[in-house]
Design a protein with these regions (language model features):
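Ordered, amphipathic secondary-structure segments that act as subunit-interaction surfaces
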Residues: 82-94
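Divalent-metal-activated hydrolytic enzyme cores
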Residues: 1-29, 64-69, 81-84, 99-180
């Protein structure tokens, strides 16, 4: 698959397909969106929000969560605020999310089946990584949105005046419901 993508890319560049996407690094709407990496949202999310190329910084991860105050999603939001002029943040979870009810136990069995050893997992734990917490999903989507919004709003590096709001998007219709 990757080789096919590389071949496509060569044609894309040769035909100057990139020209209609040219923009600068600053989001025109001074907006960042933290959302799930679910494939159903790849085109639906920006379309349902009326966002075009260059309008917003879109940060995606499993579940659209900030799981700790200094994880990579939070780091990206801090960079968006201070380096890219973001003034508003939308946290957008979605219906029927695969991160809901994720568990380390499931991942553990999958990892072992694919050749990861217990010794490797034990070494990771001895290094201070709580895999159970790190790979844990959430049970309640609105509550996960609330927690993420609160983590962002109360973060010591987020300046006063940054607007943070939380939503759930229907992953079929694109309907947006404000949660927090």
């Amino acid at each position: 698959m990757i080789d096919q993508i590389i071949d496509y890319n060569k044609t894309f560049v040769e035909q100057k397909g990139y020209e209609k996407y040219l923009t600068d690094k600053y989001p025109d709407k001074k907006l960042a969106v933290l959302s799930c990496m679910d494939t159903r949202l790849t085109e639906l999310l920006p379309a349902a929000l009326g966002l075009k190329n260059g309008d917003a910084k879109i940060i995606k991860n499993a579940g659209g969560l900030v799981i700790s105050a200094f994880d990579s999603a939070m780091r990206s939001l801090i960079v968006a605020i201070y380096e890219l002029g973001v003034e508003e943040i939308m946290v957008v979870a979605h219906s029927h999310c695969g991160a809901c009810h994720m568990s380390y136990e499931h991942f553990y069995h999958e990892m072992i089946a694919r050749g990861i050893t217990d010794e490797t997992l034990e070494t990771i734990c001895k290094c201070g990584v709580n895999l159970d917490h790190w790979l844990e999903g959430f049970k309640d989507t609105p509550e996960s949105v609330r927690k993420t919004v609160e983590t962002i709003k109360t973060h010591p590096l987020v300046p006063k005046g940054i607007v943070v709001r939380g939503f759930i998007i229907d992953s079929e219709t694109g309907a947006l419901e404000e949660i927090f």
